[in-house]
């Protein structure tokens, strides 16, 4: 059974909280992609208690990214749950030191699998 660290960010206040989920809640995340939205009720997360303020009941969590067990970041433009080496010039997983620099980097695809350890989500009201 997989265990995920869920980093929940509130874009209105700029606050981020970390929650660990296990069991049936993790099965609801496996197979989802970056950009998908999940109702917070499905994951049994009490956002009002976690953030200390009131949220509407229909609040959703939008998947924004994550990292796998070895620290490789997820990229929205690589499809599937696989790990690949790609030539990057910008974006998640690469910070160029010079203008126009490109380099091969190992990154993870955009689909959540049991190898993912951390999932970054943001609140969508």
From Swiss-Prot:
The keyword Transcription does not apply. GO terms for molecular function: structural constituent of ribosome. Keywords: Ribonucleoprotein, Ribosomal protein. GO terms for cellular component: ribonucleoprotein complex; ribosome. One of its GO terms (biological process) is translation. SMART domains: Ribosomal_S6e. InterPro entries: Ribosomal_eS6 (IPR001377), Ribosomal_eS6_arc (IPR020924), Ribosomal_eS6_CS (IPR018282). It comes from the Archaea. Belongs to the eukaryotic ribosomal protein eS6 family. Part of the 30S ribosomal subunit. This is Small ribosomal subunit protein eS6. It comes from Pyrococcus furiosus (strain ATCC 43587 / DSM 3638 / JCM 8422 / Vc1).
